[in-house]
From Swiss-Prot:
It is an enzyme of class 2 (transferase). GO terms for biological process: cobalamin biosynthetic process. Its EC number is 2.4.2.21. Pathway: Nucleoside biosynthesis; alpha-ribazole biosynthesis; alpha-ribazole from 5,6-dimethylbenzimidazole: step 1/2. The lineage of its organism: Bacteria, Pseudomonadati, Pseudomonadota, Gammaproteobacteria, Vibrionales. This is Nicotinate-nucleotide--dimethylbenzimidazole phosphoribosyltransferase. Catalyzes the synthesis of alpha-ribazole-5'-phosphate from nicotinate mononucleotide (NAMN) and 5,6-dimethylbenzimidazole (DMB). It comes from the Bacteria. InterPro entries: Nict_dMeBzImd_PRibTrfase (IPR003200), Nict_dMeBzImd_PRibTrfase_bact (IPR017846), Nict_dMeBzImd_PRibTrfase_N (IPR023195), Nict_dMeBzImd_PRibTrfase_sf (IPR036087). The gene is cobT. The active site is at residue 316. NCBIfam families: cobT_DBIPRT, PRK00105.1. It catalyses: 5,6-dimethylbenzimidazole + nicotinate beta-D-ribonucleotide = alpha-ribazole 5'-phosphate + nicotinate + H(+).
């Protein structure tokens, strides 16, 4: 990212009628948004625009779920996607409240949505980009092929591109997939210097006994990732929804479009994207710090300062949807707050 306007933008923020830094993280959000929207321009922007914020929820099933790493069976992935399309989930409530466009992407559930609700086959909020009927059990074998990784990156890029072409200049990603905290934990362990027990958490609310087993299963997958590159690790232990989110992050960067990053699984996808293209980090804002064990560690890897810490552990993109009003507030003060000079305030 071209940061040549950073000092000019910071001066504009500092000259608002407030003590220096008094708006905390909102000032950093305003700086980053203004920098992003100043790319390829001859001068820094005086107004931050937020147009058609769009939530993309990526859904997929995981073979590792057969090992009992979640309190819920894999069938719940499809059931929750049906709930999303019916408008009954938490993410629907928050998107409706904050006027966020909503789409759910079937990246590879065990079965397509119409096998459960035939009328949802052509639902306007459903995008089908299936890579298969769920991944393989990564505790025992490779989760997906390298060809599926490549196709998943392409599919995710196309989903993000379409949202941007439809008028969005701020994306949010969420996820749904029973077993996906195991996949995200394995990826984070394999691609960072972190220990497996730092990256694995309670997910949907498993017992201590289940957690101990989950750590062992994740370690089995991670052990196959030694000496592999990022895409190789994605193939070994990744998820269909995770790889498509990685592709979507990469595409958002190509379009110079910021992404408001949700919780643990989305943050791991963000981290993976930075390993493939470090400049994707310049186009990320971080919504919240969740209760999931590994989230604080991946945020540290990304040198991220999340806006909220509400004890959330739901996923779906809920943290990002809840943080959007703060992002809008950052734009609002940047656009409309008086300067010392215009207000006639002397300090």
């Amino acid at each position: 990212m071209d940061r040549s306007f950073a000092s000019e933008i910071q001066a504009r923020i500092d000259n608002k009628t407030k003590p220096l830094g008094a708006l905390g993280l909102l000032e950093k959000v305003a700086l980053e948004l203004a920098l992003i929207q100043s790319q390829d321009k001859l001068q820094s922007v005086e107004t931050i625009e937020i147009r058609k914020p769009t939530m993309l929820v990526f859904a997929g099933d995981h073979g590792i779920a057969k090992e009992g790493v979640s309190i819920a069976p894999s069938a719940v992935t499809q059931q929750m996607v049906a709930n999303f399309l019916a408008g009954g989930a938490a993410i629907n409530c928050f998107c409706d409240l904050n006027q966020i466009d909503f789409k759910v992407v079937d990246c590879g559930m065990l079965s397509p949505i119409d096998t459960l609700v035939p009328d949802f086959k052509h639902h306007p909020n459903l995008i089908e980009r299936r890579l298969g009927n769920g991944t393989a059990n990564f505790a025992k074998q490779t989760a997906m092929s390298l060809e599926q990784v490549a196709l998943g990156l392409e599919y995710g890029a196309k989903v993000a591109q379409q949202a941007i072409l439809n008028g969005s200049n701020l994306l949010m990603f969420g996820e749904m997939g029973i077993g996906n905290t195991s996949s995200a934990s394995a990826l984070l362990t394999a691609l960072s210097l972190l220990e497996v027990d730092h990256c694995v958490g309670y997910g949907t609310g498993i017992t201590q006994e289940q957690l101990n087993r989950k750590i062992k299963l994740v370690a089995q997958g991670v052990n196959r990732c030694h000496d592999l590159d990022t895409k190789g690790a994605l193939a070994q232990v990744g998820g269909f929804e995770i790889v498509q989110m990685v592709g979507a992050f990469l595409e958002a960067k190509r379009h110079k479009t910021p992404v408001l990053v949700d919780g643990f699984i989305v943050s791991v996808a963000a981290y993976v994207a930075t390993l493939l293209d470090e400049e994707t980090r310049d186009y990320m804002l971080f919504a919240h710090n969740s209760e999931e064990n590994g989230h604080k560690f991946v945020l540290e890897c990304l040198q991220a300062e999340p806006l909220l810490d509400l004890g959330l552990r739901l996923g779906e993109g809920t943290g990002a949807a809840l943080a959007l009003p703060l992002v809008k507030a950052a734009a609002q003060f940047y656009n409309n707050m008086a300067s010392f000079e215009s207000a006639g305030v002397t300090v």
